[in-house]
Amino acid sequence: MGALEGAVVLGQSTSNVCMTRFDDIRLLRINYLRGPNLWTYRPVLEVWLDLGQLEDYPSNKIDGFTDRLTALLPALIEHHCGVGERGGFIQRLTEGTWSGHVLEHVVIELLNLAGMPTGFGQTRSTSEHGVYRMVFRARDEQVARVALAEGHRLLMAAINNDPFTAHDVQKAVDAVKAKVEDCYLGPSTAAIVSAATDRGIPHMRLNSGNLVQLGYGANQQRIWTAETDYTSAIGESIASDKELTKSLLASCGVPVPEGQVVANAEEAWEAAEDIGLPVVVKPSDANHGRGVSLELTTREEVMAAFAVAEPEGSDVMVERFIRGHEHRLLVVGGEVVAAARGEIITVTGDGKSTVAELIEKQLNSDPRRGAEEEYPLDLIVLDTDAKLQLELKRQELDGASVPAAGRVVTIQRNGNMANDCTDQVHPEVAHAAVLAARVVGLDIAGIDLVAQDIGKPLGPQRGAIVEVNAGPGLLMHLKPAVGSPRPVGRAICDHLFPNDAPGRIPVVGVAGSQDTAVLARLVAWLINLGGRHTGLACRDGLFLERRRVDARNSANWDAGHRLLVNRAVQAVVIENGAETILRDGLAYDRCEVGIVTDLEGAEALADYDITESDQMVKVLRTQVDVVLGEGTAVLNAGDPRVAGLAPLCDGAVILYAADPQAAALAAHQAAGGKAVLVRQDRVVLANGSSESFLPGLGRLTVWRATHVGVSLESLLAAVAAAWALGIPLNLIGAGVEAFEADLQAALASLQLSQTQPLSSPQLQLA
């Protein structure tokens, strides 16, 4: 129970500050923001709270509240809060803070105790009395909702001095932990995702399990635990057939134990006699050591082992027993990146305890053991482990036997890869492991071998490779019981994205309220002319290349997500209204170009407590915040508030304005910045003090007469975005000239082009 030990609710009042019983805090609205938002870059759960009567009672006015809460959650002392030091949150409680803020910290602490640490949370008042918006970092929505419910229950108990003990706190933590285990990524997948995040590679979960996309669009790679896009289905099938694997390895000079596939227990004994005792009996297509019995020397043992192995696989194999230690070598992309050594698990009798009791006291009490994937060692369950029961029977014991004091009882002979030995692997052993993975056809493989000393070649010690496993578990290397953890997640990430490849495609985000759909279409048109298969999500629909595949309003998170998972897409343009950012967050984590056209539209956002245009700065700055360091923000210099977002950008800034006298332009150009503006009825590209006309595009008066649906500001923003993306200037000018502003005309033009011979020059869809 750790930090929860001894936590109790104080049952007596210690002062006369307030003895009122309070109604529950009402949770008015719960919303999961799946991408960057006005709060943070990461997904958060946003909760609208109505404190009711508690609005008039901060924490220092509720009798005994701080003592009760800190007794229940002692680790709150570690929360710095806004004070910036240990004990900061306790100081805020003592001085007086409101219950919405307290709930934020309670939920965060429950997540920490459940093994999903988070340090981010905020609580802000709204324009309505007693109503607050509270958010906290949420890597999984369902986990966050359970943590919120449990935290709400705990907080109200502490406020009202209701019975709530350490046991109740532990139940709350267990409920959150159970949801983590049920919903969140397994440890192997999480390690790879974490390594990708460290490298700045985005990830997207594709199902409720461990299927994850790393990167975007055409540059993505997918993983499923330790299987990747490069993992061969044929290789997996070969690895699952142990006899075929051995045959292929032997033909390539890899040492393997001789063996035979048998159909029944009698054949198993005959094979054992042919091979020579002792032998191993195991399933031909199982893994993780299931159903494997080692060092069998008698007919009875072999036949009993057959009965253990048969339910675990389609066939049963009998192999020569190789003396030595079990080892697991992890091969990634033709290199051994980690190795672990197994150990025989034993208990020692005390003359009083049964074998079952010794297992509980000496083995299962080890904090490294657990039933969940996060533990490096498994719990040992005697009642359901036929292999263990057979092992005890070989020693003339069972679970109820009481071994004499000092007697060592073998519990498990294999499957306990707990000790890191990566630095000890001999180069010839590593070569054999890499060759085995290559022969089977796996980019990532767990190579099981037996050797007396992993630091010496296999041949002289008669060592051998006994299995090649597809989709190997990584936990033994991430959390070895003995030795140093190995960065296997990073090794797999580097294998998938060599040479520091970011896994990204050009992403252009368009934020604002005025003419943003046609602007997004024009940008997508120019990118497509530049040679990239382009996806577009905007209010006019969802487009792949020049085809509209969905006519519904697609300026939202779901439509953007559809583009980013599409392997055919080489660039995307996504329109983001303020409501999209407030309701869902952005569909992407970072972008190469972020465009902000204006800060209008507050009147439509009253449901989000946005009532003034000045509040839009906090919302639409999100688009600027996510621009990559090597990217560009394209900002409307005609609106000083939009131009004022420039310092928030990690990358470069291009300003645009129809009025060349816009105040922001002069200062920006004087500092050497780029700008797109209008002079002499022409589009001008400015780089510091140097200016030139955009080639390929003539007088704007003529152009605007034939492109009625495109505002001058949208034209300038699109030119700036294309310039930032490195599209040739003459192609930008020609593309703007050829753009079909009217959507229906563009759709009709595309339909017509599809009925003509390929050589017919037809206007294509923007």
What are these regions (language model features)?
Residues T20, Q221-I380, P427-A430, G489:
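Active-site nucleotide/adenylate-binding loops and adjacent lid/helix of ATP-dependent enzymes
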Residues R504, R583-L765:
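Acidic, Mg2+-coordinating active-site environments of NTP-dependent enzymes
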Residues R547-D584, V596:
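Conserved nucleotide-sensing/catalytic segment adjacent to the nucleotide-binding pocket
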Residues L358-N416:
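Extended, charge-rich helix/loop segments that form flexible
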Residues G2-D198, E335-A338, E343-D350, T354-E357, ...:
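ATP-dependent carboxylate activation and anion-phosphoryl transfer catalytic cores
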Residues H129-V131, V135-D274, N287:
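Conserved N-proximal alpha/beta basic substrate-recognition cap immediately N-terminal to
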Residues A196, D448, A537, E575, ...:
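Residue-level signal for inorganic ion chemistry
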Residues N499-E545:
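Walker A (P-loop) phosphate-binding motif
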